Structures are given as structure tokens and as C-alpha cells.
């Protein structure tokens, strides 16, 4: 059955990819940009148009003719954002029988796959094919963006079509996750090598939507690529430790360096780019993004000053001004939770992809594993300080001395939904603690710092089991998903 499934998937993928690369090319590259074919022949307009579409397609909010925002809701917000323990929604989608209770909806699960392959990988393929020889820098940046886009897809599903995307051979098969990750490392290595031949500001910086404003340089792209390589190396630390150590060493020793300064936040900009944050639309306009119970438990327990940056106080009678979350799988009388804490994200909030804080925590884990000469505790504390700087919540010294742990979760309306705290590590670094306790501290703080990027948080929680999350209250998977182990991957869409 497995062989038959893969054969059918591969055959249908070829049809999808061929159609995507040809039939709608004009729609993707003209209608949404305002550039005419004649204008595209000048300067970097052709590549710039493709590049902008790809950047909009990472934290997906690209309008291919069927509206915006709702794609992101099913691609990420009702999946990774919820499974990561970050967010929840009080509305009973599909009569309450949706992903929140592990009754996985094919129409939701497939949008990440379908939209990425149908609209984003096509642009990457065009950029690679046309820039490889003529514009190596464009080619290199396309490679970096390709990895940033596609590692998220592999983290969702496992095997993906990557190395042979767009080929017409009917025998094309998906890459295993291991092969895909090895290809990610090759692409990042090639991109870094190509960009090392350049210096100064990008010649196409006006199309750059994700590097920090005033720092849109080739060097910044190399630091992002290096940091991305370190992220992926740490991701496979348990599955393929030798390869992980090798790739981490390349990142940690490369002269271009890593993202580490406060300004080096990689995010899709909403400032005059035509991009709006889809999570902000779902949150502010639709009223469908609320604090998850795990965020309440951990941030309130730690007395974490970032809590007010991430969520608004509740407005319900009797608990107005407090921070209240919703536990995943909460019973379907959801309207009672409509006055709980909502996200602070707006349509104008830049969509964060990677921060210096995350990179410091990656360095902390690398040091903990003996991959570098750095001190794990020093890197850990620098990660916390970097996140405090990013959110402008003051100095972190008091927090880093704190022995506070997560608080018990008390449901506002239903006592049986309440739960004892599961995360029992404190912010204070303890050099005498066990290696596993140190890892739990690193990942828990990285989870806090990565907010609101649910894809990365969910991937790391599945890899390590940290932070320890409350299990789903109601499990409607018919035994397919273990309540304690929790969901590990999304199903492939039936369409493939």
C-alpha cells in the first residue's frame, strides 16, 4: 500500500508541477505586480517580481486571485500555531470537529502543500533557471529563500518534492526527509559561496522585503543563510548527529558570521511592500486568534514581561485585565471564551521568520552538545537578553536569576479543563543541572522567544518534547493520534 501511495502521489505531483510551471505563469508574474512585460525587460524587474512573490509566500499572504489571509489561516494558524501551544480559537469550525480535536481536515491540511507548490515554488524555479548564469547573486538568494520555504513544508509532512521539482519525468519521486535536508544544506552552502564574491548593498535591495531596513546587504543574507543552516543542523541533531555536527561547524566557523545583533531580525516587512500580516487580519478583523493555555501557564508563572507584548488582557466580566488562555480541545461552547486574551499582532506587524535570540539558543544547544567551544549558559543568557531587547521590555538580569516555574492552568468556566503545570524548569541557568534539564531550559526559552512563528515552535517541540505542553482535551482522531505523544505531522492532502 505504501509503494502504491508513493507512486500515485508522484504521478499526480508531476501533473500539478507541470501545470503550475506553465499554465498560470502570466497570472502569477503579471497580474499581482503591476509590471508590464515590457517593463520587466529592464533592470532587475523580472527577478524582483519573482523574488517578492516568494517572500510573500513564506509567511503566506500572496493573492493569486482568490483573496488573502484565509490561506494562512488553514496553512498555519489552525495547524502549527495551535499545535505549538501558542494560540487557539474559540470558534467551533466544522461543528467543533476540526484540527483542534485531532479530527484533521483534509481541506486545511492540504493548503500548505498546494499553495506552496502551486504558487511559490514555480517562482523559485523561474528565478533559478533564468539567473543561474547571468545573475549569480539573485540565484544565491533564490536558493536561500527556497530552503526557508521548503524546510517548513518538510517539517509539516516529511517527504517532499524538492531536488526534482518541475521535471517532466513521470517517474519523479519525492525526496525522503533525510535527502531533502541534505539538499537544503547543499543549497545553503552554494548560496553562501556565491554571495561571498559580493560586498556592500544588494543591487536589488528595493525588492528585498525580509532583511532589516538599512541593512539590506549581501553580508546580511550570508548571515541569514548561515543561521538557517545552524537551525537545520540542530533540527537533525538526534536523527543524524554526525551530519548535524558537521553542518553546525560550518555555520559556527564561517567568517560571515551569524545573526546576533539586536537589529538583525529577519521578517517580511509590511512597510510599503504590498504585504500585510495575515495573522493580524485573522486576529484583529476576524477576532479568531486567542492565547493558548500553555502560554498563559508558562508566561504568567515566570512573570515574563513579554506577556503583554504578545497578548492583550482579557475583557470578560469578573476577570477583565487578567491574561486568560484557552486549552486545545476545549468544549464547543466556545462563545464563552470570546473575551479571553487576544494576540497583539496587527496587519501592519512584520511577519517574523528568524531572530538573533533564536540563533543564540541554537548556539547554546550546539555548545551543550560539544559542537563548539562556546559556553552553553552564556549563549542561553544572551538569547534571553536578545529577546528582551527585541521586545523592549528592559533588562533581563532579574529574570535570569528567577527560580519561578510555570503556573497551574485554571479554566475560567469549566473546572475539569484545568491542569497542573507541566513545565517545571525556571529561567535561571543552573550549571550543576543535568544535560537534559539544561536542554529543556534552552528549548523552553527559545519557544518563548520564537513567538509568534508557530511553524518553528511546533517543529522544535516535536523534536525535543519541550516545552512540556498540556495534552489535547478531546481527541477525535479515532486512535490515529496518541493524546500524550500528540500530533507529529500533517497528513498529505488527498488531492495528491
Each predicted region: which residue ranges?
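Terminal processing/anchoring signals of secreted or surface-associated proteins
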Residues: 1, 21-24, 54, 147, ...
Amino acid at each position: 500500500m505504501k509503494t502504491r501511495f508513493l507512486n500515485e502521489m508522484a504521478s499526480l505531483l508531476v501533473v500539478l508541477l507541470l501545470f503550475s510551471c506553465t499554465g498560470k505563469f502570466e497570472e502569477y508574474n503579471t497580474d499581482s505586480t503591476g509590471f508590464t512585460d515590457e517593463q520587466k525587460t529592464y533592470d532587475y524587474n523580472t527577478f524582483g517580481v519573482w523574488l517578492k512573490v516568494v517572500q510573500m509566500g513564506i509567511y503566506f499572504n500572496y493573492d493569486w486571485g482568490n483573496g488573502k489571509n484565509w490561506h494562512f489561516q488553514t496553512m498555519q494558524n489552525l495547524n502549527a500555531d495551535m499545535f505549538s501551544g501558542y494560540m487557539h480559537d474559540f470558534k467551533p469550525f466544522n461543528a467543533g470537529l476540526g484540527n483542534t480535536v485531532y479530527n484533521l481536515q483534509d481541506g486545511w491540511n492540504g493548503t500548505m502543500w498546494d499553495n506552496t507548490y502551486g504558487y511559490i515554488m514555480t517562482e523559485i524555479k523561474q528565478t533559478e533557471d533564468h539567473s543561474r548564469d547571468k545573475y549569480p547573486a539573485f540565484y544565491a538568494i533564490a536558493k536561500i529563500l527556497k530552503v526557508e520555504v521548503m524546510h517548513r513544508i518538510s517539517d509539516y509532512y516529511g517527504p517532499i518534492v524538492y531536488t526534482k521539482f518541475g521535471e517532466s519525468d513521470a517517474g519523479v519521486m519525492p525526496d525522503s526527509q533525510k535527502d531533502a535536508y541534505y539538499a537544503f544544506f547543499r543549497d545553503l552552502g552554494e548560496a553562501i559561496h556565491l554571495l561571498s564574491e559580493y560586498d556592500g548593498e544588494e543591487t536589488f535591495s528595493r525588492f528585498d522585503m525580509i532583511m532589516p531596513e538599512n541593512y539590506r546587504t549581501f553580508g546580511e543574507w550570508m548571515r541569514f543563510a548561515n543561521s538557517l543552516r545552524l537551525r537545520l543542523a540542530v533540527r537533525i541533531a538526534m536523527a543524524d548527529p554526525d551530519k548535524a555536527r558537521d553542518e553546525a561547524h560550518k555555520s559556527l566557523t564561517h567568517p560571515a558570521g551569524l545573526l546576533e545583533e539586536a537589529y538583525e531580525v529577519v521578517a517580511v516587512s509590511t512597510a510599503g511592500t504590498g504585504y500585510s500580516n495575515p495573522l493580524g487580519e485573522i486576529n484583529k478583523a476576524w477576532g479568531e486568534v486567542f492565547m493558548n493555555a500553555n502560554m498563559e501557564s508558562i508566561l504568567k508563572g515566570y512573570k515574563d514581561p513579554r506577556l503583554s507584548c504578545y497578548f492583550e488582557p482579557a475583557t470578560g466580566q469578573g476577570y477583565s485585565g487578567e491574561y486568560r488562555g484557552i486549552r486545545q480541545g476545549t468544549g464547543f461552547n466556545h462563545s464563552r471564551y470570546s473575551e479571553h486574551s487576544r494576540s497583539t499582532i496587527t496587519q501592519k506587524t512584520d511577519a517574523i521568520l528568524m531572530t538573533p535570540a533564536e540563533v543564540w539558543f541554537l548556539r547554546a544547544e550546539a555548545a551543550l552538545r560539544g559542537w563548539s567551544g562556546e559556553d552553553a549558559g552564556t549563549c542561553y543568557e544572551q538569547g534571553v537578553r536578545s529577546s528582551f531587547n527585541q521586545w523592549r521590555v528592559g533588562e533581563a538580569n532579574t529574570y535570569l536569576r528567577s527560580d519561578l516555574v510555570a503556573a497551574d492552568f485554571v479554566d475560567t468556566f469549566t473546572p475539569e479543563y484545568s491542569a497542573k503545570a507541566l513545565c517545571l524548569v525556571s529561567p535561571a541557568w543552573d550549571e550543576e543541572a543535568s544535560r537534559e534539564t539544561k536542554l529543556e531550559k534552552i528549548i523552553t526559552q527559545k519557544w518563548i522567544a520564537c513567538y509568534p512563528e508557530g511553524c518553528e515552535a511546533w517543529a522544535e517541540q516535536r523534536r525535543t518534547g519541550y516545552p512540556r505542553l498540556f495534552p489535547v482535551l478531546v481527541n477525535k482522531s479515532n486512535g490515529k493520534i496518541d493524546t500524550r505523544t500528540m500530533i507529529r505531522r500533517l497528513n498529505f492532502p488527498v488531492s495528491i
